[in-house]
């Protein structure tokens, strides 16, 4: 049968059916979703229209995440999927999609911070210097060992899981959303 992106199968406004006057075409082709899971890296190549390639990530465990306020990007491990505005099912099954909120390992960012500023993030003696550079909400996450981040790439299409560390108003927004979900 095949997945088709046509509109010939749709009904009219009145509820009647349109007469089907042609077969499915290759250019109307659709494919099943990749539903990229959290696990050891497994990426497949898919030939698309025009001979282009899409990289269908079936499993991913790491990606490039950038820390916007410090202007630094590091490859880090994705630990868990914690929130998805689209569906709770995607959180339960740990599916990586664009705009999913995940927790990432903060170790690469800690190492960069130490080499760049010469101060450790959790050092109590240098707390005044760190406080001016890193907000308190982010420091709490660094000490807990889990940074909240948002996926900005499309793992099912480009085969990568890249994103950015949540900060400021956006971090507060998603924290409120997750707290609300926990209470319900």
From Swiss-Prot:
Molecular function in Gene Ontology: structural constituent of ribosome
Keyword 4Fe-4S: no
Region listing for Disordered, in residue ranges: 1-23
Record-linked CDD domains: Ribosomal_S8e_like (cd11380)
Record-level GO cellular component terms: ribonucleoprotein complex; ribosome
Record GO biological process: translation
Keywords tagged on the record: Ribonucleoprotein, Ribosomal protein
Bias-annotated ranges (Basic residues): 7-23
Record has Acyltransferase as a keyword: no
Family: Belongs to the eukaryotic ribosomal protein eS8 family.
Protein name: Small ribosomal subunit protein eS8
Organism per entry: Theileria annulata
């Amino acid at each position: 049968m095949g997945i088709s992106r046509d509109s010939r199968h749709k009904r009219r406004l009145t509820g009647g059916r349109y007469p089907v006057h042609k077969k499915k075409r290759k250019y109307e082709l659709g494919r099943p979703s990749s539903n990229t899971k959290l696990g050891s890296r497994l990426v497949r190549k898919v030939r698309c229209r025009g001979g282009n390639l899409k990289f269908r990530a079936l499993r991913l465990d790491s990606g490039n995440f950038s820390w916007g306020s410090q202007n630094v990007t590091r490859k880090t491990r994705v630990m868990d999927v914690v929130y998805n505005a689209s569906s709770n099912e995607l959180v339960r099954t740990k599916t990586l999609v664009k705009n999913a909120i995940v927790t990432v390992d903060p170790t690469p960012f800690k190492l960069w911070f130490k080499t760049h500023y010469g101060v450790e993030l959790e050092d109590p003696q240098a707390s005044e210097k760190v406080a001016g550079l890193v907000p308190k909400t982010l420091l709490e996450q660094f000490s807990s060992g889990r940074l909240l981040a948002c996926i900005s790439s499309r793992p099912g299409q480009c085969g990568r899981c890249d994103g950015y560390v949540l900060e400021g108003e956006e971090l507060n927004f998603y924290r409120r959303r997750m707290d609300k979900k926990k209470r319900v």
